[in-house]
Amino acid sequence: MISVAINGYGTIGKRVADAVAAQDDMKVAGVSKTKPDFEARVAIEKGYDLYVSIPEREKLFGEAGIPVSGTVEDMLEEADIVVDATPEGIGAKNLEMYREKGIKAIFQGGEKHDAIGLSFNSFANYDESLGADYTRVVSCNTTGLCRTLKPIDDLCGIKKVRAVMVRRGADPVQVKKGPINAIVPNPPTVPSHHGPDLKTVMKGVNIHTVALLVPTTLMHQHNIMVELEDPVEADEIKARLDETTRVMLVRASEGLASTAEIMEYAKELGRSRNDLFEIPVWEESINVVDGELFYMQAVHQESDAVPESVDAIRALLELEEDNMKSIMKTNRAMGIL
């Protein structure tokens, strides 16, 4: 069984730690925190070894009564691979430390593709990361795009994609971000970064995206228009998405007409933190007009890319060469539909 270090135990890191702990071929070597907050205390209560990201702050953990097992460098000595879930831009700075330690590393979508050199999605380009030293799991939004566009491309080919990304203003825990009472083009230039990010894993796809921030914390929402290579009916698209794992069709007619109601449904699934790893697509929105497909989907930004981090671990360490075998193994352990 391989040991996985989680550098950064925040929104993504704590979810990746629990996902790794749920697998039968890997375990958590330890998790790291910069400060002795409630998340650090919960990590200890869950049985994870806790390490300090900033050595000078180790004394603060002791004063707070939170035991630590050493520094991040000590944690890396106990691990076969590290998942870097530190804030945007910090991961790229950590890359040199991982190189010096000779340890493979997986980064999150907040890091630039060029800084890491390779990006990852379980469905689109798993093979490219087999045996690699470093890879980057694409962002929550890009993961959402890939989850639905890849099966559509496999079914009938894609000429061109245009997508409007309606992004949440902040995560639920982020009290210092917004907007509170505005709609913000983010960025105000076209295209947004999401299209180029998708191209790092779906090579050659013709896509342009625009994005805006809105005053909500629950989910992102995508409005997607796809010019298709081959003619298909809307029902064929529905059937393909319905059979695609990590995607779910939801119906407004059944009370799932908004992101709020979708997250209420996620609560009913009984998962930790009410996570929704799957990408919900509104079935009523799926329509084909003159060879162009239209559909709407939502993305739970805190959790949708978490299973991809588990698959990336298997790819880098060559624990599983077949992407679908890894996907299904991860799904079973995490209860993903």
UniProtKB/Swiss-Prot annotation:
* Segment forming the signal sequence: none
**Binding positions for D-glyceraldehyde 3-phosphate?**
139-141, 194-195
The transmembrane residues are none
Coiled coil located at which positions? none
Q: Where is the active site?
A: 140 (nucleophile)
Disulfide connectivity? none
Q: Which reaction does it catalyse?
A: D-glyceraldehyde 3-phosphate + phosphate + NADP(+) = (2R)-3-phospho-glyceroyl phosphate + NADPH + H(+); D-glyceraldehyde 3-phosphate + phosphate + NAD(+) = (2R)-3-phospho-glyceroyl phosphate + NADH + H(+)
Q: Which GO terms describe its cellular component?
A: cytoplasm
Query: Would the keyword NAD turn up in this protein's UniProt record?
Result: yes
Q: Where does NAD(+) bind?
A: 11-12, 110, 168, 301
Q: Which PROSITE patterns match?
A: GAPDH (PS00071)
**Main location class:** cytoplasm
Does Oxidoreductase appear among the keywords?
Answer: yes
Cellular location(s): Cytoplasm
Which keywords fit this entry according to its UniProt record?
Answer: Cytoplasm, Glycolysis, NAD, NADP, Oxidoreductase
User: One Pfam annotation, family name?
Assistant: DapB_N
Which pathway does UniProt place it in?
Answer: Carbohydrate degradation; glycolysis; pyruvate from D-glyceraldehyde 3-phosphate: step 1/5
Q: Which CDD domains match?
A: GAPDH_II_C, GAPDH_II_N
Membership in a protein family: Belongs to the glyceraldehyde-3-phosphate dehydrogenase family.
Assembly, per entry: Homotetramer.
What name goes with this protein? Glyceraldehyde-3-phosphate dehydrogenase
Q: Which organism is it from?
A: Methanothermobacter thermautotrophicus (strain ATCC 29096 / DSM 1053 / JCM 10044 / NBRC 100330 / Delta H) (Methanobacterium thermoautotrophicum)
Instruction: Identify the taxonomic lineage of the organism of origin.
Output: Archaea, Methanobacteriati, Methanobacteriota, Methanomada group, Methanobacteria
